[in-house]
């Protein structure tokens, strides 16, 4: 293998591949994770597939700049709303938990990578991860077909594990203010996923399937 192609075998039945040329290694039945590096802004450089004859594009933002703007504004709004019960319940615990607040905030800010990895493990075939840190984005792209339910689960998975569950635990045990702050940040960072879930629920008919091609989602019956 060359220096840019390092394969890491996990205990589960998938492999991690660093590969910028979209070559496939290993058995077909294994999910293979490809770290593709920095997104260059050219959608034609992303993985693509031949469109299904009856494919209909999602009505969604056309480029990463518009998407990042919507996602960042939505993120701030959601975190602002969630901060209200956080302050009401946790205000008395914050002074004595400054270190845990700092840890929760730092971990929340660093959760972008595990967030995308949790998206990736929902795929059964090749999935590619890119970073676009100039627009505060990381994203994964996989071109396999998914049912409406699996697509919604894939979008929701990291937000549930990293955000919603920790925040609910804080609501039950408000002394865990660091965990609550972590949950707030992780829930807010998933705003782009909530847009995808909304689009799937609103636009995809019953029994339809969806797939990604470049930056855009399509559905078909």
Name the predicted role of every residue range:
Residues 1-30:
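N-terminal amphipathic/basic-hydrophobic helices that include classical n-h-c signal peptides
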Residues 32-86, 137-221:
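Metalloprotease/metallohydrolase-associated module, dominated by Zn2+-dependent proteases
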Residues 86-95:
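Short, hydrophobic transmembrane alpha-helix segments
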Residues 96-112:
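Short pre-active-site segment immediately N-terminal to the catalytic Zn-binding motif
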Residues 111-124, 158:
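Active-site recognition of the HExxH zinc-binding catalytic motif
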Residues 118-126, 165, 200:
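Active-site-flanking alpha-helical
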Residues 128-136:
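Peri-membrane helix termini and adjoining interfacial loops of integral membrane proteins
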């Amino acid at each position: 293998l060359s220096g840019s192609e390092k394969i890491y075998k996990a205990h589960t039945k998938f492999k991690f591949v660093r590969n910028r040329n979209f070559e496939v290694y290993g058995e077909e039945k294994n999910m293979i994770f490809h770290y593709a590096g920095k997104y260059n802004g050219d959608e034609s450089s992303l993985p693509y597939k031949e469109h299904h004859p009856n494919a209909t594009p999602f009505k969604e933002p056309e480029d990463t700049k518009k998407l990042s703007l919507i996602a960042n504004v939505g993120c701030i709004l959601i975190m602002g709303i969630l901060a209200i019960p956080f302050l009401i319940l946790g205000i008395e615990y914050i002074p004595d938990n400054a270190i845990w607040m700092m840890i929760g905030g730092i971990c929340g800010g660093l959760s972008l990578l595990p967030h995308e990895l949790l998206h990736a493990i929902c795929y059964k075939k090749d999935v590619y991860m890119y970073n676009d840190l100039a627009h505060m984005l990381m994203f994964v792209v996989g071109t396999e077909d998914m049912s409406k339910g699996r697509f919604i689960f894939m979008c929701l998975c990291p937000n549930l594990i990293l955000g919603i569950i920790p925040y609910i635990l804080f609501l039950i045990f408000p002394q865990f203010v660091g965990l609550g702050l972590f949950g707030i940040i992780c829930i807010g960072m998933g705003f782009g996923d909530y847009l995808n879930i909304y689009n799937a629920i609103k636009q995809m008919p019953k029994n339809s399937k969806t797939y990604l091609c470049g930056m855009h989602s399509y559905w078909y019956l």
